[in-house]
Regions:
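Active-site neighborhood of HAD-like aspartate-dependent phosphohydrolases
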Residues: 1-48
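Acidic, Mg2+-coordinating phosphoryl-transfer loop and its flanking beta/alpha structural elements
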Residues: 115-153
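Substrate-recognition "cap/lid" segment bordering the active-site pocket of phosphatases
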Residues: 73-115, 122-124
Length: 160
């Protein structure tokens, strides 16, 4: 159940933000060179590994009373199973209660919120997102510890 409508809304991307899409893609290309789109293989999305500190930081954000945290991920047009596999990944790594906070949308700009943590600033509607984009993997936010530091120092302090 979602009840905190006055909270700061934070969306978190999955692929190459929460989980290591790139490493799995490279490994599948090496292991199965005949497969043009590794992400089309059944089990690809469910088998992705979490990025370092991603789970701990996501849980920390979720535990802050002033934040309303959702996962906002785009589907793969190459793999219709990605919908169910991403849902299973969320349950396995973040718990069943987080499944209710999973949004799969091909256009991220349709969602209203304050922050979007994503490895891309465009391509799936991010460029139309009205809040602030926290570009994961950038020089300002190279990892999850820097993302947490931002929210600890900038956002939590401002609301205290």
């Amino acid at each position: 159940m979602i009840t905190n409508t006055a909270s700061t809304i934070i969306y978190v991307d999955m692929d190459d933000t929460l989980c290591d899409f790139r490493a799995a893609y490279i490994k599948h290309r090496q292991d199965y060179p005949e497969i043009t789109y590794p992400q089309s293989m059944p089990g690809f999305f469910h088998g992705l590994k979490p990025l370092p500190n991603a789970i701990d930081t996501f849980n920390w954000l979720r535990d802050q009373a002033q934040f309303d945290v959702f996962i906002l991920t785009a589907p793969s047009v190459k793999n219709p199973l990605c919908y169910s596999e991403k849902r299973l990944w969320v349950e396995e790594h973040l718990g069943f209660e987080t499944v209710n906070r999973l949004i799969i949308s091909a256009h991220k700009g349709l969602n209203k919120g304050h922050f979007l943590i994503d490895d891309n600033a465009g391509g799936k509607g991010q460029e139309l997102f009205e809040g602030m984009i926290i570009k994961y993997g950038s020089s300002q936010f190279p990892d999850w510890l820097s993302v947490r530091h931002f929210f600890e120092c900038e956002v939590v302090t401002d609301q205290a």
